[in-house]
Amino acid sequence: MVHTASGREVRHGLEDDDADTICAMATPSGQGGVAVVRVSGSRALEVAEEVAGPLPAPREAGLRRFRDARGETLDHGLVLVFPGPGSYTGEDVVELQGHGSPAAVTAVLEALCAAGARPAGPGEFSERAFLNGRLDLTQAEAVASLIEAETDGARRAALRALSGAFGQRVDGLADRMIDLRALIEAFLDFPEDEDVPADPPELAAEIEALGSELAEIRRRAAAGVRFGEGIRVALVGPPNAGKSSLLNVLSGEEAAIVSAQAGTTRDVVRQWAALGSRHAELLDTAGLRDAEAQDEIEAEGARRARAAASEADLLLVVIEAGKTLDEELRARIAEQAPRPVVVIVNKIDASGDEAGWEGESEVGAHVRRARVSAHTGAGIEALRRGLAALVDREAGEDAWAARHRHIEALDRAGEELEEALVVARRGGQEELVAEALRRAQTALGEITGRVSHEALLGRIFSGFCIGKE
């Protein structure tokens, strides 16, 4: 028996209290043309009929008046019925589609609760879909990721995970671990049986193959985490090179103060923008120059600029046209490898240089170069296209929407495989190999829900929206 995030007790996907029926608004709150109220549970049909009257045939829309227990009309709209177990939650589901008036929605929800439903908790519809076997945990979380997606890349990554591809890959790897464990344990239990190999065949090679598959899964999941969080893009360079102007141009907002006076930016200024298929946090930093020329506040700003550069997924080094990279900037560029760097030559309107984007730079293979004028806009569109291509290439086209908990579980599985490999190469302690494989398999099971704990489910579903998931 498990106490779920909503506080219910469930066993094998079925509620102990069979009469527990939930309702919630499934569309965003506030005024709108249409609002959808969703009802799910063993009494969903009965409860909905109390409010909407005779229900239409399954999956056929019917126009109905919504009434309270006194018969007063609350609203009118369409009703759709989705019988379980073929519904989203695996239970009987009814949707009432009325007008997007907050007062009308509240009245309908109150009438449904008076008829026997209760308000749904955060993520409870997806939670029930998981408990009833309609979704694994990666798919349930992908629903939330799809709702939260702000870029096309994040949308695509969420749909890949929602299709079940992420969970199927993880479960497939776990099954391979089970098979290898079974082989090892058969050898340990029946060492003299001629039908059982005297030694697990190429045990170390088998574990290495599992590790390679795990690394590929982690790569795609880590890319998906970055889709959800966005990437950090730091703008660094000497004072008065035009970093703040570029941040404002790229973000479309006057987020940073622009002045002809050098050293205007003293702290890190943060602004979000879309770069290609990714959401990016642009970090405008204080100018970097010789320590002797800095006061105490400017020195602290430079320290923060260096910290931002070291943590950036993409580094934009901004210099004035006619100037060269100094020793510190060259060091920063070298330290950034293999993460991408773009050297942006700004203020070409004053130098007469031609605007453009260069695919390569003599500074390093991970470095690109652009020539722009933040003042006139020359070269800015080419810069946007170049940055978008860089960002999309780094993200890849095969990412799955993923969460930090997935990465943590994959890393734990990886540590167990490394331990198993060390023991396997040493030989003679196959039982320790089998135990390490079991722990790795358990870690993978937490990703899809094959292995689930009360605290894990509570943490996952409590972060979802009410009604939408």
From Swiss-Prot:
One of its GO terms (molecular function) is metal ion binding. (6S)-5-formyl-5,6,7,8-tetrahydrofolate binds at R38, E95, R134, K468. GO terms for cellular component: cytoplasm. It holds the Pfam family TrmE_N. The keyword Mitochondrion does not apply. The keyword S-adenosyl-L-methionine does not apply. InterPro entries: G_TrmE (IPR031168), GTP-bd (IPR006073), GTP-bd_TrmE_N (IPR018948), GTPase_MnmE (IPR004520), MnmE_dom2 (IPR027368), MnmE_helical (IPR025867), P-loop_NTPase (IPR027417), Small_GTP-bd (IPR005225). GTP binds at residues 240-245, 259-265, 284-287. Binds 1 potassium ion per subunit. GO terms for biological process: tRNA methylation; tRNA wobble uridine modification. It is an enzyme of class 3 (hydrolase). Its EC number is 3.6.-.-. Exhibits a very high intrinsic GTPase hydrolysis rate. Involved in the addition of a carboxymethylaminomethyl (cmnm) group at the wobble position (U34) of certain tRNAs, forming tRNA-cmnm(5)s(2)U34. NCBIfam families: mnmE_trmE_thdF, PRK05291.1-3, small_GTP. Homodimer. Heterotetramer of two MnmE and two MnmG subunits. This is tRNA modification GTPase MnmE. The lineage of its organism: Bacteria, Pseudomonadati, Pseudomonadota, Gammaproteobacteria, Chromatiales.
